[in-house]
A protein has these predicted regions:
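Surface-exposed short loop/turn segments
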Residues: 30, 79, 94-154, 199
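A short, structured loop/turn motif at beta-sheet edges
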Residues: 41-45, 83-88, 147-154
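C-terminal/domain-edge helix-coil "capping" segments
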Residues: 26-38, 132-203
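A generic structural signal for short
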Residues: 10, 60-61, 138, 170
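Bacterial N-terminal signal peptides that target proteins for export
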Residues: 2-14
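C-terminal motif of bacterial Sec signal peptides marking the signal peptidase cleavage site
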Residues: 21-24
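N-terminal segment of the mature soluble domain
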Residues: 48-105
Length: 203
């Protein structure tokens, strides 16, 4: 029981920490998408949940996963997809992950060097300019939403919301982060239910 409990807590923390990152920047998270070019999106009219949801593999849900579900449902219904728990055309899965990263950049610095001047017959101060390498370590969080062809159990579309984990945020702030991240991912999804013609995606 102790091992299972530890894994469950760890899984919940991964989800919670990842949600902190998704609106850390003023411009919101970076969104990346990919899709199966052979998929016929015109055949998809209904949707349901993949089982088990990747974020809920610990055996229970959290307020974070429930919040994501509510947002996904709103986005799918807004595109005309009808929920079908028994036999959907598309199954939706989602997960969160964190990763330690680092970035290196140059910072201009100045210092004073002393050089002997034969004209002044003394040592004089000489300014010296140089670039100093600065390493910035940070934690990156990712929320991934997958759309899976239910008949083939094949991934046909995926979207990632990626951002840095910032300072400690309240549950209310994290809820807003989740809303914005899911909306940002689906803003890049170009299809409506029953249509294989992609709509223009805002840049």
């Amino acid at each position: 029981m102790k091992i299972n409990s530890t894994r469950s807590v760890r899984a919940w923390l991964v989800a919670a920490i990842a949600s902190l990152a998704l609106a850390a920047c003023a411009t919101g998270p970076t969104v990346r998408t990919d899709y199966d070019p052979t998929a016929n999106f015109a055949q998809y009219r209904t949707w349901g949940w993949y089982s088990p949801i990747a974020m809920e593999q610990s055996g229970y849900s959290s307020w974070i996963s429930e919040r994501i579900k509510a947002n996904v449902q709103r986005e799918m219904e807004a595109r005309g997809y009808r929920f079908d728990a028994k036999s959907p055309d598309l199954k939706v899965n989602f997960q969160a992950a964190v990763q330690e990263r680092s970035s290196v950049y140059s910072m201009p610095r100045s210092d004073i060097a002393w050089a002997y001047s034969y004209r002044a017959r003394s040592y004089v101060a000489v300014p010296v300019w140089y670039d100093e390498a600065v390493v910035n370590n940070y934690t990156e969080g990712t929320l991934t939403i997958d759309l899976v062809d239910a008949a083939k159990n094949r991934l046909v579309w995926t979207g990632d919301a990626i951002g840095r984990i910032g300072s400690r945020r309240t549950p209310e702030e994290r809820a807003v982060d989740i809303d914005q991240s899911v909306a940002g991912i689906f803003a890049k999804y170009p299809y409506q239910a029953g249509s294989g013609q992609p709509l223009p995606i805002p840049r």
